[in-house]
Amino acid sequence: MIRKPAVAGYFYPSNRNELLSLISSFHVQQSEVSCQPIGVVVPHAGIVYSGRTAMYSYNALRNSSIRDFIIIGPNHRPMTPYASIFPSGSWETPLGNAIINEELASELYKNSQYIVKDEESHSVEHSIEVQIPFLQYMFGNSFTFVPVILGDQEKVVANDIASALMRLSKPYILIASSDFTHYERSDIVERKDMDLISRIVDLDIDGFYDTIERENVTACGYGAIAILMIIAKKIGAKISLLNHSNSGDVTNDYDEVVGYSSIVACRQI
């Protein structure tokens, strides 16, 4: 099955050349990552707003030899409490078709109590779709991916999926798709996001969930972030913030913004 793009022309240009031009404009200066990336956190807003921040994470993956990606994001319209996997086929974007790794998808599905095969839930969800053009820009056709979107994002689900991922037979890089605090003043977004990011960097999983609830941090893909944190903690990886921004940096309206973060988890080689 080929999944057709749901948000081309809305979250990113539907024209191939315009899309390539926009992504290539997100030139960022950053140091080489001197360790082996196991995963990243990336935003999933319209890429004119969050693409520059997202590029920090994708640049961190540039020199990795691993070309199989598990992309986990939120289901913004959850019809089920379960996590939905798109098990086979490909996803179409203006840059071509990206191939699903059916072997890894099948393993992940079998390893988890909470993952169900559910292509329909992916049909209009954007949190994974907006990542595909970045991977195509970076790696052409030389990658595969597995898409999973979360309904319930609580710790029990995150722990189950993290455990399922750690039992996969092939190496992969985890892409956790999440925006951070939504639609508050930029100073409030900065405070809430940095409070949450400090928990992420410290691999404080309980503190992370406590902060989400106590501070009402509206990070829509928090379950995906938690999965990355759990895996990083279990294997002794470290997490670092690469970049943080908000939509006001593009619109110049700082009264009601959305926060974006680029974060990498890696272990020493």
Swiss-Prot record:
What Pfam families does this protein's entry cite? Answer: Memo (PF01875)
Question: What CDD domains does the annotation carry?
Answer: MEMO_like (cd07361)
Among Gene3D superfamilies, the record links this protein to: LigB-like
Q: Which organism is it from?
A: Thermoplasma volcanium (strain ATCC 51530 / DSM 4299 / JCM 9571 / NBRC 15438 / GSS1)
**Xref: InterPro entries:** MEMO1_fam
The entry's family comment says:
Belongs to the MEMO1 family.
Q: Which protein are we looking at?
A: MEMO1 family protein TV1383
